[in-house]
Swiss-Prot record:
GO terms for molecular function: adenyl-nucleotide exchange factor activity; protein homodimerization activity; protein-folding chaperone binding; unfolded protein binding. This is Protein GrpE. The lineage of its organism: Bacteria, Pseudomonadati, Pseudomonadota, Gammaproteobacteria, Vibrionales. InterPro entries: GrpE (IPR000740), GrpE_coiled_coil (IPR013805), GrpE_head (IPR009012). The gene is grpE. Homodimer.
């Protein structure tokens, strides 16, 4: 083989090596680009997963906050209801603490009124006594009325079963039907609660 042929052969080998090197470089470049693209997709997937986790955690936190807010509102409502009930019970106890005591006073009032009605107003001897009893009765009524005790004296009024107790029913040309003709015994109420109904005669 001549020198010229050797030289040409070497040049061909060099060209072939250069082509192979370029091919390998291109292959490596393509591989690198694929790796970069894969890494980017992997990072994106990981980011989206973290975002999803954060969103789920946020929703869970919001739900817990809502539950706690509802619990606080319920607790406040229960406290308010308890406070209102307590105030009502205290007010009720205050109003009706004298209920039993007032019931015990009613016979005394009845006896004073019977004494006034039975007294001989024409007698000079009885007159001073009657005045004393009348004054005592008035003072007594004025005093107990300050504590919410009120008499029920419904003569001439329509019969009310919540306030009156019908002891007798009679026909009457002078009264409308279901009207109280006569009060046999006055009734009393304490702060709006009947402690004794009025005993009455009702027109038929």
């Amino acid at each position: 083989m001549s020198n010229q042929e050797k030289k040409m052969h070497e040049e061909e080998l060099q060209q072939q090596e250069t082509v192979e090197a370029d091919t390998e470089a291109e292959a490596e470049a393509v591989g690198t680009d694929a790796d970069i693209e894969w890494n980017e997709e992997s990072a994106l997937d990981e980011t989206e997963a973290k975002i999803a986790q954060l969103e789920a955690a946020l929703l869970s936190s919001e739900a817990k906050v809502k539950e706690q807010q509802d619990a606080v509102l319920r607790a406040k409502a229960e406290v308010e209801n308890m406070r209102r009930r307590t105030e009502q019970e205290i007010d009720k106890a205050r109003k009706f603490a004298l209920n039993k005591f007032a019931e015990e006073l009613l016979p005394i009032i009845d006896n004073l009124e019977r004494a006034i009605q039975a007294a001989d107003t024409e007698s000079e001897v009885v007159q001073p006594i009657l005045e004393g009893i009348t004054l005592t009765h008035k003072t007594f009524i004025d005093t107990i009325s300050k504590f919410g005790l009120k008499e029920i004296n419904p003569e001439g009024e329509a019969f009310n079963p919540e306030l009156h107790q019908a002891m007798s029913i009679q026909e009457s040309a002078d009264h409308e039907s279901n009207t109280v003709m006569f009060v046999m015994q006055k009734g009393y109420e304490l702060n709006g609660r009947v402690i004794r109904p009025a005993m009455v005669m009702v027109a038929k």
